[in-house]
UniProtKB/Swiss-Prot annotation:
It comes from Nasturtium officinale. This is DNA-directed RNA polymerase subunit alpha. Its EC number is 2.7.7.6. Keywords: Chloroplast, DNA-directed RNA polymerase, Nucleotidyltransferase, Plastid, Transcription, Transferase. Residues 267-327 are annotated as: Alpha C-terminal domain (alpha-CTD). Gene3D superfamilies: 5' to 3' exonuclease, C-terminal subdomain, DNA-directed RNA polymerase, insert domain, RNA polymerase, RBP11-like subunit.
Length: 327
C-alpha cells in the first residue's frame, strides 16, 4: 500500500494518486485528488466522473456457453458436483482483460476426476484471465467435459434473454463493468470569496483495470462525449430580433415523410384521427392544443412547426414517425 501526504497547489490545477493498494487479484483500490477547484466545480466533476467510471468503461465477459452434455440450464450432469446453473454462474464471475472487438471463441475441455478452474479455459491470444484460481466445476468421475464459450467486450449490463436452447447454447448474464464502485467527496478550504475545493475520488476495480487506468479511460470517454460541442458549425446558429434561434437539422423528417406519402393515400390521412395513433399522453395533448386532429393535419406541419409547439421536443418527432411507419 502506498500513502502520500496531500499537498494543495494554489496555482495550477493538479491531480494526484494519494493511495493505491491491491487487496486481492480481483480487488484494486485507488484514491485520487484534484485541486484547487472553485466552489461547485468539485461536485460537477465528481458526479460526471463517477457516472463515467461506472457506465462508460468497457469490460470483457463470457456471454454464452455451449455443451452437448447439457440438456438444459437447470439440469444436473452425472459425474459433476455442481448443477449446470451453478457452472454458468461461476463462468459469469470469471474476470477477463482484453483489447478485442467483436466476439471471440474460447474452450474448456477437461477429463475427470478433478477441479475445473479458470486456468483450464483455452483463450484467444487477445484475452487474458486475471485470476486463474477461480472455480468453475468439480468432476467427481472419469468423464470428459467440453464447453464452448463466447467472449465479448462491451459496457454496462447484458441480461440473458429467453432462448429455446435447441443448439445446447446457454446465454450468461454479463456485467461489463471493470469498476465495481466509485465515490467522490469534497474538502473545502479558505474563507469567503477565496473558498476553494479539493475533489477526492475513490475507485475500486475488479483487477482487469487498475484504478489509475480506469480514471484515464473514464476521462477520455467524457472528453469524447463533449467533443461534438466544440465543432458545431457556426452557420447553424443565427440571431434575429434579439432572440437566440437555432436552425434545426432536417433530421430524416422530410425524407421519411415523403416515403410515408408514397406508401399511403393522402385522402386516407384526412380520416385518420390522432386518437387512433396510440401516442403518449403528453404528445397527444400537445398536438390537440395546436388544433392538430387528424393525420393529415399532422403531416402538413414541418418539423420546425412541430418544434414550436409548447412542451414538444425534437425526440417526439422521431417517435411520431416511428408510430406512423408501423401503421
Amino acid at each position: 500500500m502506498v500513502r502520500e501526504k496531500v499537498k494543495v497547489s494554489t496555482r495550477t490545477l493538479q491531480w494526484k494518486c494519494v493511495e493505491s493498494r491491491r487487496d486481492s487479484k480481483r480487488l484494486y483500490y485507488g484514491r485520487f485528488i484534484l485541486s484547487p477547484l472553485m466552489k461547485g466545480q468539485a461536485d460537477t466533476i465528481g458526479i460526471a466522473m463517477r457516472r463515467a467510471l461506472l457506465g462508460e468503461i468497457e469490460g470483457t465477459c463470457i456471454t454464452r456457453a455451449k455443451s452437448e452434455n447439457i440438456p438444459h440450464d437447470y439440469s444436473n450432469i452425472v459425474g459433476i458436483q455442481e448443477s449446470v446453473h451453478e457452472i454458468l454462474m461461476n463462468l459469469n464471475e470469471i474476470v477477463l482483460r482484453s483489447n478485442l472487438y467483436g466476439t471471440r471463441n474460447a474452450l474448456i475441455c477437461v477429463q475427470g476426476p478433478g477441479y475445473i478452474t479458470a486456468r483450464d479455459i483455452i483463450l484467444p491470444p487477445s484475452v487474458e484471465i486475471i485470476d486463474n484460481t477461480q472455480h468453475i466445476a468439480t468432476l467427481t468421475e472419469p468423464i470428459d467435459l467440453c464447453i464452448g464459450l463466447k467472449i465479448e467486450r462491451n459496457r454496462g449490463y447484458s441480461l440473458k434473454m429467453s432462448n429455446n436452447f435447441e443448439d445446447r447454447s446457454y446465454p450468461i448474464d454479463a456485467v461489463f463493468m471493470p469498476v465495481q464502485n466509485a465515490n467522490h467527496s469534497i474538502h473545502s478550504y479558505g474563507n469567503g470569496n477565496e473558498k476553494q475545493e479539493i475533489l477526492f475520488l475513490e475507485i475500486w476495480t475488479n483487477g482487469s483495470l487498475t484504478p489509475k487506468e480506469a480514471l484515464h479511460e473514464a476521462s477520455r470517454n467524457l472528453i469524447n462525449l463533449f467533443i461534438p460541442f466544440l465543432h458545431v458549425e457556426e452557420e447553424t446558429f443565427y440571431l434575429e430580433n434579439n432572440q437566440h434561434q437555432v436552425t434545426l437539422p432536417l433530421f430524416p423528417f422530410h425524407n421519411r415523410l415523403v416515403n410515408l406519402r408514397k406508401k399511403k393515400k393522402e385522402l386516407a390521412f384526412q380520416y385518420i384521427f390522432i386518437d387512433q395513433l396510440e401516442l403518449p399522453p403528453r404528445i397527444y395533448n400537445c398536438l390537440k392544443k395546436s388544433n392538430i386532429h387528424t393525420l393529415l393535419d399532422l403531416l402538413n406541419n414541418s418539423q420546425e412547426d412541430l418544434i414550436k409547439i409548447e412542451h414538444f421536443h425534437i425526440e417526439d418527432v422521431k417517435k411520431i414517425l416511428d408510430i406512423l411507419e408501423k401503421k
